[in-house]
A protein has these predicted regions:
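Conserved core of the PLP fold type I
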Residues: 1-125, 136-157
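Conserved core segment of the aminotransferase class I/II
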Residues: 12, 152-233
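PLP-dependent enzyme catalytic core of the Aspartate aminotransferase-like
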Residues: 32-35, 159, 282, 296-318
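Hydrophobic "anchor" residues on beta-strands that sit immediately upstream
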Residues: 94, 128-129, 164
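Glycine-centered flexible beta-alpha turn that most often forms the glycine-rich phosphate-binding loop
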Residues: 132
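Conserved C-terminal alpha-helix-loop-beta "cap" of PLP-dependent enzymes
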Residues: 188-189, 193, 263-306
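Conserved glycine-rich beta-strand-loop-beta hairpin in the small C-terminal domain of fold type I
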Residues: 226-240, 252-267
Length: 318
């Protein structure tokens, strides 16, 4: 599904977020393959955060004391002019990415953006590209969209050890009871397995077996996602059509129309996101907090609202 080699994949437990946390934690306490010292012994550590983005990503790096640097998102992915300038600083240790159907904008990184990311030459020898491919097969409008393999792209530019890719079946089988994985170079795999071998004996092999028997292969898994799409598309259509009918004529907000992923990203007139969500709560609708999609939970424009339509029935959404 990721397009990489079997030897580059480590299958874990139910949560890719745990694998992401562990990767940053190991870099902090032990360093990575090319670290001169553990990150905890660096005088200053900074992290690039394409924004709006995933609040749990930001919380991980915030919890380890990183200075979080906001990178504006464009229609093609993070603003790479800004990224390429910032990575000249050796204290910049990594960058979060949700490259396909980004959380929350639903943006797919362009081939050019992926090329520029894969060919980066950071000043930090242990710069860590965290590639959270959470929605790699999560189209709900149209067919599966093939996506470049970031591992081979990085290898092409001499950066094989720069990237760790993550994915899970949380939105394929059962959230909280699926399986997750990370993918990386063989050299990184050898290094990480030595550390993981001290931490754990194994993950839930029976659950891994259940998933192999149920998902079977790529073709069968994509067919399953088509069934998910039948459930999800009417919900997203309901949200977008309501916004277009009720809000568009007023000219007080803009939004993205994603073809996959799990969110609709709405931008209100600046200064109104918190007030809008307060009114929603008074009406009995609780949504993701305003500012959650920004580092430190602070949206300087107080504008972005993340709408997640997947849970309620269409009738409730309406």
């Amino acid at each position: 599904l990721l397009g990489c080699k079997v030897s580059q994949v480590f299958v874990g437990g139910n949560a890719s977020l745990q694998l992401m946390y562990d990767t940053v934690s190991k870099a902090y306490t032990h360093g990575l393959l090319h670290s001169e010292k553990p990150w905890c012994k660096e005088e200053s550590i900074k992290w690039l955060c394409p924004t709006p983005g995933y609040d749990r990503h930001f919380k991980i790096t915030e919890s380890f004391g990183f200075e979080l640097i906001t990178i504006p998102m464009t229609e093609n992915g993070p603003d790479m002019d800004i990224v390429e300038n910032l990575i000249k600083d050796p204290s910049v240790k990594g960058m979060w990415n949700v490259p396909k159907y980004s959380n929350p904008d639903g943006i797919i990184y362009s081939d050019e953006t992926i090329r520029r990311i894969a060919s980066m030459k950071p000043a930090a020898p242990d710069f860590l590209l965290m590639w959270d491919n959470a929605y790699c097969i999560h189209e709900f409008d149209g067919d599966f969209v093939p996506f470049p393999d970031i591992l081979s792209e990085c290898e092409k530019y001499g950066n094989a050890d720069m990237v760790f890719e993550f994915a899970s079946t949380s939105k394929v089988t059962l959230p909280g009871a699926g399986i997750s994985c990370f993918a990386c170079s063989e050299a990184n795999m050898e290094y990480m397995c030595k550390l993981i071998g001290i931490q754990a004996i194994s993950f839930d092999k029976m659950n891994q077996l259940r998933h192999v028997k149920f998902l079977q292969n790529k073709e069968h898994t994509l067919a399953l996602m088509k069934e998910h799409a039948k459930i999800l598309k009417p919900k997203f259509d309901m949200v977008v059509s309501t916004l277009e009918r009720e809000i568009a004529p007023l000219g007080i907000a803009t939004w993205h129309k994603p073809k996959g992923g799990y969110f609709v990203s709405v931008n209100t007139t600046p200064g109104l996101a918190k007030r809008t969500l307060a009114l929603c709560k008074e009406a009995g609708v609780v949504m993701t907090s305003a500012g959650a999609t920004y580092p430190y939970g602070h949206d300087p424009a107080d504008s972005n609202i993340r709408v997640a339509p997947s849970l309620p029935p269409v009738e409730e959404l309406e």
